[in-house]
Amino acid sequence: MEDPVIRIPPYHYIHVLDLNSNVTRVEVGPHSFIRQDHERVVFSPKRMVMVPPRHYCVVLNPVARGPTGAVLFDGAGQAQLRHADLDIRLTQEPFPLYPGEELQQGVTPLQVVLADTALRLRALLDFEDEDGNKFVAGDEWLFEGPGTYIPHKEVEVVETLQATIIRHNQAIRLRARKECLDRQGTRRVTGEEWLVKRVGAYLPGVYEEVVDVVDAYVLTDKKALHLRATRTFEDVQGHVRRTGEEWLVTQEQSEAYVPDVFEEVVAEVLVTTLGPRQYCVVLDPVGPNGQPQLGQQRVVKGEKSFFLQPGERLQAGIQDVYVLSEDEGLLLQALQTIKDTDEDGTEVIRRAGDRWLARGPLEYVPPAEVTVLERRQALALAENEGIYVRDIRTGKVRVVTGQTYMLTESEELWEKELPPGVEVLLAEARGDTAGQDSGIQSSSGPSFGVQERDRTRAVTYQVPHNAAVQVYDYRERRARVVLGPELVVLGPGEQLTVLSLSGGRPKRPHARRSLCLRLGPDFCADIVTIETADHARLQLQLAYNWHFEVPEDPKALGRLFSVPDFVGDACKALASRVRGAVAAVTFDDFHKNSNRLICSAVFGFDEGGRLREHLRFVPNGLVVTSVDIQSVEPVDQRTRDALQRSVQLAIEIATNSQEAAARHEAERLAQEARVRLERQRLLDQAEAERARRELLELEALSAAVESAGAARAEAQARAEAARIEAEAAILQAKLKAEAVAIETEAELARLERMQAQEVRAQRARAEAEAARAQALAAVEASKVREVAAALGPETIRDIARAGPELQVKLLQGLGLQSALITDGAAPLNLFSTARGLLGLAVPPEPSTS
């Protein structure tokens, strides 16, 4: 059952509900509350709300209080509430919450606003503060620190504002959220932006917002700032800038520049520095009025540093001054009529489009009215080198060779075009490709490995020894032939004649291309198919030796090139003659007389019926001097087999006859060898018999000598042996006596040495023992002296007397006057009696040794 007595501690309270009147009241401790039957305690004792210093709390539906601060109650005794109202309570005595009151916000520390900080406040309803200031709902203002903000129920804290730190070379960009006055008292309209450049902390106003922190651009003598106006305004220097206007700010105007809100930074412009040998051309330069002069140019020479103004640009960047040596020049052209001086210093008028050449040595900076078309250098040409030069006024082309030449203002280099085949052959002649002989063998098409030729250089060709080259001039329609060794330099309208010769076996047309014609002597080979009268088809491989007859008249040299393919034409003509001659004979006749038939067919016979020595082709002077039959092969298989069988049979017959002759010769040589061998054998036998007879005679003589000398030698040997034995016995006895004497002397010496050693050892031991005893005695004596000196006489006397006195005292302590038990057999030692009775060990006797 619930206890009716409720003990309320100090600073606690309870709510008591009267069930009869349905009114709740507050009971505050300390006291003991006795609950009545018609009352009910809503909750157990609860601690009062305590607001410490610098804190506050918010109470919802606070009680109404009178002028004196007392709580107002209605007629039923219920505390009157201000419903939907708030009450902010600061530091005060602990207070209870009346029925209906709610603690909307607990005890909270008051907000401390630091320096350079502010609270943006907004009025929730119309009110008037303690200072008489009236605020309308929606008004905003700042509570700036340092200070402690006391909250009000009519005001809400929107945000906390921090001051923006403005450092050196910085500014902040502000924007007005509505019409207001800024910190300097200037009126700002909604959306207006401005800069604040004052160094330090800046706290924006209530209707100001920080858009950005703008860093200043540090300007040096090498960097400037390109600005553009976004609207018409007046800058800090007092100049009125129109929308879109661009200008440059340099270090002379400001070392650190902060762009205004209506200024847009286009770029940072670096200084343009010109060296003493440099210049530049500025396009669209800015005039004295600050406006760009469109279409104009200005040449700036070094040594100088400047900034390009807005709208200005360099034509080709920074350029080097033209420094010309003696062999250099500049081709110039006037863009408009100007006054100039020539090489002699005379003033001349240059019209627009005029061209002239400025020759070195000089330093030249072209003015804005002059353009440099080309930088020319004198071309050093050797005796065998040249260039093609064309006059642009007349169009004539000429060749300049063997001198150092510089083109004039009306001349230019001309490129000579050559057919691709000629280019390949010339490259092979120069060794620029992997071709073989210079112009003798080449492919019919252009090669991809050919290096590009300088077409402005004169085309030269080295004519080999014993060769000829034909050069045709298409302008004058005449040809000239050059015999090697010689260097050919082609004129502007000249071309080299390309020979297209047959090659291979059998000959194929256009197999070889060449620029030169070999004059020989040389040879060419061809394969000719012939048919005999008995229809035997044969294939001949023939080789012809040839050369050209060179006429002495230079005008007649052109006939050498009258036949383009002299190899093919000659081989065809010779093959026709051979085929005609062979067709009239049978195979056997041709096989027997092939060389005579072919030579007669090729060379023919003179009026006397003799075989000619050469064949001459009249159109080009080609002379064939000899014919060589390298091989003859039948074309028909059966003919080839029959010919092969006949050849094999002839070979077998010749081989058999050679074998028979060789066998007969071998038998003859073998028979002669056998006869010589038999004769030699008989001679050897006779010689052997004669040698054996001599041997027997010598053996008999030796036996006689041997029998006579054996007895004499034996007697001499016995006598000598007896003498040697006697001498050996005498020598042995003498040696034995000497050995015994030596042994005796050695033994005696050994015994003497042994005895001497023993005597010395005994003497050393005795001396060592005596020294040891003497040292021990000295040590013992020194020990006794040192112990006695250390203890002193008094201590020694006390030690000597301590033993007997102690024994007497012990016996007295035991209560014994005297006692002795012994038998007659045991001797008595009264000196150790007391020690024995006490159980002490007898001290050992000193050793007499």
Curated annotation (Swiss-Prot):
<dbReference type="Pfam" id="PF01505">
    <property type="entry name" value="Vault"/>
</dbReference>
<feature type="repeat" description="MVP 1">
    <location>
        <begin position="2"/>
        <end position="54"/>
    </location>
</feature>
<dbReference type="InterPro" id="IPR041136">
    <property type="entry name" value="Vault_4"/>
</dbReference>
<dbReference type="GO" id="GO:1990904">
    <property type="term" value="C:ribonucleoprotein complex"/>
</dbReference>
<keyword id="KW-0963">Cytoplasm</keyword>
<keyword id="KW-0687">Ribonucleoprotein</keyword>
<dbReference type="InterPro" id="IPR036013">
    <property type="entry name" value="Band_7/SPFH_dom_sf"/>
</dbReference>
<feature type="repeat" description="MVP 9">
    <location>
        <begin position="459"/>
        <end position="521"/>
    </location>
</feature>
<dbReference type="Pfam" id="PF17795">
    <property type="entry name" value="Vault_3"/>
</dbReference>
<dbReference type="GO" id="GO:0005737">
    <property type="term" value="C:cytoplasm"/>
</dbReference>
<dbReference type="InterPro" id="IPR041134">
    <property type="entry name" value="Vault_2"/>
</dbReference>
<dbReference type="InterPro" id="IPR043023">
    <property type="entry name" value="MVP_rep_sf"/>
</dbReference>
<keyword id="KW-0539">Nucleus</keyword>
<dbReference type="GO" id="GO:0005634">
    <property type="term" value="C:nucleus"/>
</dbReference>
<comment type="function">
    <text>Required for normal vault structure. Vaults are multi-subunit structures that may act as scaffolds for proteins involved in signal transduction. Vaults may also play a role in nucleo-cytoplasmic transport.</text>
</comment>
<feature type="repeat" description="MVP 2">
    <location>
        <begin position="55"/>
        <end position="109"/>
    </location>
</feature>
<feature type="repeat" description="MVP 3">
    <location>
        <begin position="110"/>
        <end position="162"/>
    </location>
</feature>
<dbReference type="InterPro" id="IPR039059">
    <property type="entry name" value="MVP"/>
</dbReference>
<feature type="repeat" description="MVP 8">
    <location>
        <begin position="379"/>
        <end position="458"/>
    </location>
</feature>
<feature type="repeat" description="MVP 7">
    <location>
        <begin position="322"/>
        <end position="378"/>
    </location>
</feature>
<dbReference type="Pfam" id="PF11978">
    <property type="entry name" value="MVP_shoulder"/>
</dbReference>
<comment type="subunit">
    <text>The vault ribonucleoprotein particle is a huge (400 A x 670 A) cage structure of 12.9 MDa. It consists of a dimer of half-vaults, with each half-vault comprising 39 identical major vault protein (MVP) chains, PARP4 and one or more vault RNAs (vRNAs).</text>
</comment>
<feature type="repeat" description="MVP 6">
    <location>
        <begin position="271"/>
        <end position="321"/>
    </location>
</feature>
<protein>
    <recommendedName>
        <fullName>Major vault protein</fullName>
    </recommendedName>
</protein>
<dbReference type="InterPro" id="IPR040989">
    <property type="entry name" value="Vault_3"/>
</dbReference>
<feature type="repeat" description="MVP 4">
    <location>
        <begin position="163"/>
        <end position="215"/>
    </location>
</feature>
<dbReference type="InterPro" id="IPR021870">
    <property type="entry name" value="MVP_shoulder"/>
</dbReference>
<feature type="repeat" description="MVP 5">
    <location>
        <begin position="216"/>
        <end position="270"/>
    </location>
</feature>
<dbReference type="InterPro" id="IPR002499">
    <property type="entry name" value="Vault_N"/>
</dbReference>
<keyword id="KW-0677">Repeat</keyword>
<dbReference type="Pfam" id="PF17796">
    <property type="entry name" value="Vault_4"/>
</dbReference>
<dbReference type="InterPro" id="IPR043179">
    <property type="entry name" value="Vault_2_sf"/>
</dbReference>
<dbReference type="InterPro" id="IPR041139">
    <property type="entry name" value="MVP_rep_dom"/>
</dbReference>
<dbReference type="Pfam" id="PF17794">
    <property type="entry name" value="Vault_2"/>
</dbReference>
